[in-house]
Amino acid sequence: MAKTNSINNAAYDQLNKDADRILQLIKVQMDNLTLPQCPLYEEVLDTQMFGLQKEVDFAANLGLIDIEMGKEIMLRLEKELSKLHEAFTNV
């Protein structure tokens, strides 16, 4: 049972790391490359978010994480991205 919890924790940690990586990628892109209205920005964001959602779905389907935990990861990232987007568009 301890091994199962360890695997579940590892899956949750990895999903959080991936969410943080997306947030960092968008921060760098906004700081150095482009504005939020740019189609490239939208494409990168959509692709990354879609990929993370698929990871969350996969982990939930395997029983590695609870679906609610997955929703929390996605919601946290969406909130952070919204704050970041708002900060850059209100400059």
From Swiss-Prot:
Q: What is this protein called?
A: UPF0358 protein Sca_0738
The entry's family comment says:
Belongs to the UPF0358 family.
From what superkingdom does this record's organism come?
A: Bacteria
Q: Which residues cross the membrane?
A: none
Query: Sorted alphabetically, which InterPro entries does this protein's record hold?
Result: UPF0358, UPF0358_sf
Instruction: Give the organism, scientific name.
Output: Staphylococcus carnosus (strain TM300)
| A Pfam family | DUF1507
